[in-house]
């Protein structure tokens, strides 16, 4: 029974469409608001059970549309009878619409009703084609937007002669009236009817709703919206004015001739929302985060919790926005005091608030590879216990390494190690510095860094420059860049004077746990020179200055003569580190600093008259252990003398003699007047003395004695004779030209086509071993074998003449008559004392003297 009903001819009424649990995009919000308004409008007019969910399902039969068309026609005829003068200025319908009341959804009767309504809107109401829809748009839900816009335009036109209009039409009339008052425009000739009084909205104030929508963007510099009057705002950097109204639960914006939601309007015009999916409130990627907090509060005191930094930012896959956070260059963060029982703490100090740059998007979720393996400070945005979150500017991360942020004083982050925690302080430096790279594995914590800069961590030498009177708590290695990208980098730790006098009660012990905490501060482990002696990895600070000040950063920061008189021992108490070990460490450090500074000043030891020394012009160059500067002279003198004497003279070559057979020409020899010093290289080959005649093709090569000190003047070769012998195609003689002593492959004159080579694939025999399917044993026919012999007969003359390996006696390949045939064709004896390159008309020969078999021949 159920099968019979399921296969009936009459289609069943489709149920409600399945709604997605995912929230709709912001571009569909204004359609939902308009459908709610139109559904309420039709419910008030005809008492229908209609809302935004079943709006299209109620209209798909066309009955409600045709009924409304007939109602508008009746109201227009009544208005024409009451005010004929006003009716003449307004386009009014004259006829109604025929409707089939028995139409069911999806049938042709329903399509006919919708088609009749569309024709009535075009003919009687004069609605533009831009606002019209087709039958398929409503029946198959192809274009819901056109259906909504058409009904809204019909409500605007019908409202002129007394038909109730949707609430959006009334809001439009209010805005138009306000514009006419502001611009002092005359009222329209047929005055529009007075809109009904608006019901008070039970939602929040309009300004609060606008502020709530704008605050979805978590950037410090948000899209500006300035209130001009009630419901009127100026947006962005331009003078664009928008009108905002509240329609039920939606904040609508009057845009052009239609409406849009404020959220969708901001998504299209706010530059931050245009480039970020997380700033859109309707994004289904993740729920919106908490409101942004950009204040950083630091509290010092024994009873206060550890300093925390609260920065809530939304994740975004695209590049960060240009931050505009203005801070004074004199404001600094002093290192907070850890509240551990083993360390002293200062008296409570009032909490200070400092505006900090938000975290870059690439640093909010650190990967395990970005964290340090040592117990030093970590760069992490997640607050774990009492750890302090470090913030790095996303704007400076995208800049060039040598470019400081504009409008701010260049600052240097100096790290102070305290146990397993890492607290970071900020102090200004005169150099142009960058954000430190918080890695011990040569990977940056805030994203990828240039490979040449990260390679400087493995340099065997580090030059340490110490400022006098500096606190040992604020010391950090710094990487000095050279102007040449090919040179390496050199770490230079610079002691910076703190923002205030150091506290005696503070200690800064940051090793691997082998030393206990005490009253003083030990900075000797932060001053170890070589990487193999360091107990933990340091954070390097890249300092890039001008090209002229690169060397001055290392050589002029501190005079090496004053290093001996510098006060090396600080007032501190070490419980685990002995005096001997500490003194040895300082002595080694002092010797290393002096040695490195002497290496850097090696350029000043030479006089100005010596110009051939290879001292780098820019950058910092640190040679390896035991390395010295190259002595002046050496192999460079030969090159300089060769350049001073000028280029050697060249032979004049007749260009007309160079033709197609130019491959067979002998190489021209340098003029005998040039000595070996001009060439700058040793003689590795032998001089060839060649004489070529037009009648005789004999080639003689004479190699002089290798023990001679001077070069033998060779005889200039005639270039015209071999050209004629090599390029003449009518000559049948075997022409042999002079070639190099080096064995080279000759290039064939004509490369055969691969299609002309009869390549037959090798067929594997059958392996099925079935007696009835064995290959045929029929012998080959006799004509086939005769054809094979006839084809191979002309090819038997493959090798005509070859030279013997010892005495140069020609070998007989194809019988005794080959020697006479060779004499007829060659016409001359060939004697070679060097390697010979065969002519193109001859068959290939082996240089060793053994003939080539036909199987060894192959195409080049």
Swiss-Prot record:
It holds the Pfam family CH. It is found in: Cytoplasm, Cytoskeleton; Cell membrane; Cytoplasm, Cytoskeleton, Stress fiber; Cytoplasm, Cytoskeleton, Cilium basal body. Residues 347-364, 530-549 have a biased composition (Basic and acidic residues). Belongs to the GAS2 family. The gene is Gas2l2. Residues 201-273 form the GAR domain. PANTHER family: GAS2-LIKE PROTEIN 2, TRANSGELIN. Residues 1-12, 758-768 have a biased composition (Basic residues). Residues 301-316, 365-393, 473-485, 724-733, 828-840 have a biased composition (Polar residues). This is GAS2-like protein 2. PROSITE patterns: CH, GAR. Involved in the cross-linking of microtubules and microfilaments. Regulates microtubule dynamics and stability by interacting with microtubule plus-end tracking proteins, such as MAPRE1, to regulate microtubule growth along actin stress fibers. Enhances ADORA2-mediated adenylyl cyclase activation by acting as a scaffold to recruit trimeric G-protein complexes to ADORA2A. Regulates ciliary orientation and performance in cells located in the airway. Expressed in tracheal epithelial cells (at protein level). GO terms for cellular component: actin filament; ciliary basal body; cytoplasm; microtubule plus-end; plasma membrane; stress fiber. One of its GO terms (biological process) is positive regulation of G protein-coupled receptor signaling pathway. Residues 32-159 form the Calponin-homology (CH) domain. Interacts with ADORA2A (via its cytoplasmic C-terminal domain). Interacts with GNAS, GNAL, GNAQ, and GNA13. Interacts with MAPRE1. Disruption phenotype: Knockout mice exhibit a high rate of neonatal death. Mice that survive show signs of hydrocephalus at postnatal days 14 and 21, along with mucus accumulation in multiple sinuses, and remodeling of the nasal cavity. Conditional knockout in tracheal cells lead to isolated cases of hydrocephalus, as well as chronic rhinosinusitis and accumulation of mucus in the nasal cavity, which is caused by impaired mucociliary clearance. Keywords: Cell membrane, Cell projection, Cytoplasm, Cytoskeleton, Membrane. Residues 1-22, 281-459, 473-574, 697-743, 758-781, 801-860 are annotated as: Disordered. One of its GO terms (molecular function) is actin filament binding. Residues 431-860 are annotated as: Interaction with ADORA2A and GNAS.
